[in-house]
A protein has these predicted regions:
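N-terminal secretory signal peptides
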Residues: 1-8, 15-22
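Low-complexity, acidic/polar, glycine-enriched regions of mature
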Residues: 29-199
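Short, cationic motifs built from Arg/Lys/His that form the positively charged side of catalytic pockets
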Residues: 10-11, 172
Length: 199
């Protein structure tokens, strides 16, 4: 099922859209709170196998809250919660394996959490969010590279949409997931993808 675009009031997104359109920035304003979940976006993970193949799965239940002042992206903050048992995967049996104690151990650790703040030097079009990632009872530093990827117009409705992404990488061994090291690589790519309707 395709995720529904997140409906955000036009006024709330004005400060985000204007820089993308090359227009003059508005005066500084208070940070806005944007909330979205699995009904409006996707949270994917990708692993490499046998140094040749890749596979991608999703978490079908998660929630995210982003605090963002478009005039000061360096003050952005994000909080994400993920239900680790909500894994969906195309390969038969993969979801059950990933929920097992060898991987996410979803029964014992049903939630993963990330809380990040923007690093200095970012722009509204691209900025890093860094902070602790808690997974399987282990907490490690983690960074998401957030981008406002592109603007487009929905040909069916005429609505203007901004596509946003946030990507990062973890070592699964750092969180205690050391099974099947000969078949599956240690580095796992994480990606959040969401579409914002602005008009």
């Amino acid at each position: 099922m395709q995720p529904k675009p997140l409906l955000i009031p036009r006024r709330a997104l004005a400060g985000v859209v204007l820089p993308l359109m090359g227009l003059a920035a508005r005066p500084a304003q208070a940070a806005r709170i944007f909330r979205f979940d699995h009904t409006q976006g996707r949270l994917e993970f990708t692993a490499r196998h046998l140094q040749v193949l890749t596979s991608t799965g999703q978490f079908s239940r998660f929630a995210c809250e982003l605090s963002l002042d478009p005039a000061r992206p360096e003050t952005a903050r994000v909080a994400v919660q993920v239900e680790t048992g909500s894994i969906a995967h195309a390969y038969p049996g993969a979801a059950d394996l990933l929920r097992s104690p060898a991987y996410f151990d979803a029964e014992r650790w049903p939630m993963a959490r990330f809380s990040g703040s923007a690093r200095p030097g970012g722009r509204i079009e691209a900025f890093d969010l860094a902070g602790p990632l808690e997974l399987r009872g282990v907490t490690q530093p983690f960074t998401l590279q957030a981008k406002l990827a592109r603007r487009r117009r929905d040909p069916a409705t005429g609505a203007e949409i901004v596509d946003c992404t946030a990507r990062g990488e973890i070592s699964r061994a750092a969180f205690g997931m050391t099974a099947d090291t000969l078949a599956t690589g240690d580095r796992v790519q994480l990606a959040v993808l969401v579409s914002l309707v602005i008009s």
